[in-house]
From Swiss-Prot:
This is Zinc protease PqqE. The active site is at E81 (proton acceptor). GO terms for biological process: proteolysis. It comes from Helicobacter pylori (strain ATCC 700392 / 26695) (Campylobacter pylori). PROSITE patterns: INSULINASE (PS00143). GO terms for cellular component: extracellular region. One of its GO terms (molecular function) is metal ion binding. Can function alone, but full activity requires the presence of the non-peptidase homolog YmxG. Its cofactor is Zn(2+). It is found in: Secreted. Coiled coil: none annotated.
Length: 444
């Protein structure tokens, strides 16, 4: 499951923990949602929260990410995210953000492997204007050369900052370069620097015309709202927008070949003083039934102060300054990723060895029922806590809507609470195999 936020309820009282534990199989706390599809194929989803805060979040989700790019044109989905805040038929470049700030809202966007997401967080009084702004960018984006060229340099600088000059950013990028050899997951959403510097406006317009269409988008409104009003205003602003191409949205055809052995890469980088390791294993795609158990393993192994990685590598053995795990849950064949940064004089190979040792312990069944019960209690506490925020609820729904798997979201909580120790042991043995591993060492 896409985790609702990095927030962890470390200060949760014992009374609340007991209460949650006692009602482990209580009713679903997931807020109800309503959905309509406009004549142009745009899906509109409303998730009313009965919190009387007056706060809403308006999202526009495009079913496109770096997964939809091709070799030589990497990073275009992310570039379009930047250009979407430039000029339109009726707005000057930067005016979108200025209008949002004037009515007291906050706007931003993100691009991942599988989704591009734009949002405005504001008061319910600004629902109409927020939808109007998003309809303007969807239907009337200019994409001009004099805006494209400077923004391309902004993105190149972002690549230097987040990837080239960041040890963990470089490690992350090189991991995907190594784990995937054919599929577009071979690169992360920022793309390769050479591609960034050689995009043309023609490339951008072609990508935009394919994927930024109403039939490939979802409008999601969460918070203190009335669903009927959401649908009426969405129809008012979006239904007149035309799809640019009546053909079906193209889907990536590049299927990653089956990995037939362990992969290892060593990266040496100037300015790196401590050693790092990224270790990952191929796991099934987003909708697979084992994803819930993999999520639980991610919590057990590498999330929070009591996780196995934190306890062993950071606190007990003092080998790492930080260590964590992440179940990526990508739309196509995915990865379960571990990253650890070594303390002075600690070799990356030693970090890898310790992570593998913990996995072998897990595969032998050395996890207790008490540990699993704690995972369930903490997961449910996180879940309930995040339902208080329109932003967190929007994030929760976004991935499942784009994957057309809202039933998966509905079932998730029950499936997590039904997990058995044997489920975690089975999944660990199924996927944490050396032949399916990719290891990248980052060294000075």
């Amino acid at each position: 499951m896409k985790h609702f936020s990095v927030k962890r309820l470390l200060g949760l009282s014992s009374v609340l923990l007991v209460t949650l534990g006692a009602s482990m199989h209580a009713q679903s706390y997931l807020p109800k949602h309503e959905s309509v599809t406009l004549k142009n194929g745009l899906q509109v989803v409303s998730v009313p929260l009965e919190n009387k805060t007056g706060v809403i979040e308006v999202d526009v989700l495009y079913k496109v990410g770096s997964r939809n790019e091709t070799m030589g044109k990497s990073g275009i989905a992310h570039m379009l995210e930047h250009l979407n805040f430039k000029s339109t038929k009726n707005l000057k470049a930067g005016e979108f953000d200025k209008i949002v700030k004037r009515f007291g809202g906050v706007s931003n966007a993100s691009t991942s492997f599988d989704i591009t997401r734009y949002f405005i967080k504001t008061s319910q009084a600004n629902l109409d204007k927020s939808l109007e702004l998003f309809a303007e960018t969807m239907g009337s984006l200019n994409l001009k050369e004099d805006e494209f060229l400077p923004e391309r340099q902004v993105v190149a600088e972002e690549r230097r900052w987040r990837t080239d000059n960041s040890p963990i950013g470089m490690l992350y990028f090189r991991f995907f370069n190594t784990a995937y050899v054919y599929h577009p997951y071979h690169w992360t959403p920022i793309g390769f620097m050479d591609d960034i510097q050689n995009w043309t406006l023609k490339d951008i317009k072609k990508f935009h015309s394919l994927y930024y269409q109403p039939k490939n988008a979802i409008v999601l409104v969460v918070g203190d709202v009335n669903s009927q009003k959401v649908f009426e205003l969405s129809k008012k602003h979006f239904e007149s927008l035309k799809n640019l191409d009546e053909k079906a949205i193209p889907t990536p055809y590049m299927k990653e070949p089956k990995q037939d052995g362990a992969r290892t890469a060593v990266v040496h980088k100037d300015g790196v003083h401590l050693e790092w390791v990224a270790l990952g294993y191929k796991v099934p795609a987003f909708k697979h039934k084992d994803q819930v158990a993999l999520d639980a393993l991610s919590r057990l192994l590498g999330e929070g102060k009591s996780s196995w990685l934190q306890s062993e590598l950071v606190d007990k053995k003092r080998l790492a300054s930080q260590a964590f795990s992440h179940n990526m849950q990508l739309q196509d064949e995915s990865v379960f990723l571990f990253i650890a940064g070594g303390n002075p004089n600690v070799k990356a190979e030693a970090l890898q060895k310790e992570i593998v040792a913990l996995l072998e312990k897990l595969k032998k069944g050395e996890i207790t029922q008490a540990e699993l019960d704690k995972l369930k209690i903490n997961q449910k506490a996180d879940f309930i806590s995040n339902l208080e925020s329109s932003s967190d609820v929007a994030g929760l729904f976004a991935d499942y809507l784009v994957q057309n798997d809202i039933q998966g979201l509905t079932d998730y909580q029950r499936q997590f609470l039904d997990l058995k120790v044997s489920d975690l042991v089975r999944v660990a043995n199924e996927y944490f195999k050396d032949t399916q591993s990719t290891t990248v060492f980052l060294k000075p």
